[in-house]
């Protein structure tokens, strides 16, 4: 019975691709980024306070008459500022 031939081995071996995630080291966030998200949250808070305390009611000052005309949209604007600031905190290092 004939013998089978021995095959040559390749000079290189194929390495399997690693599936483990590699954590990228990122430095701390810059000062302007922290200022931005804290500022956005404070703007939303101040917007809500001004609307509740000054622009609501029949005795609204003429400077805030435009805010009183927005009505319930003031809540959406204030919370949009605050939520945007909150979402930016997730990118903070």
UniProtKB/Swiss-Prot annotation:
Keywords: Cell cycle, Cell division, Cell membrane, Membrane, Transmembrane, Transmembrane helix. HAMAP family: CrgA. Involved in cell division. It comes from Mycobacterium leprae (strain TN). This is Cell division protein CrgA. GO terms for biological process: cell division. It is found in: Cell membrane. The gene is crgA. One of its GO terms (cellular component) is plasma membrane. InterPro entries: CrgA.
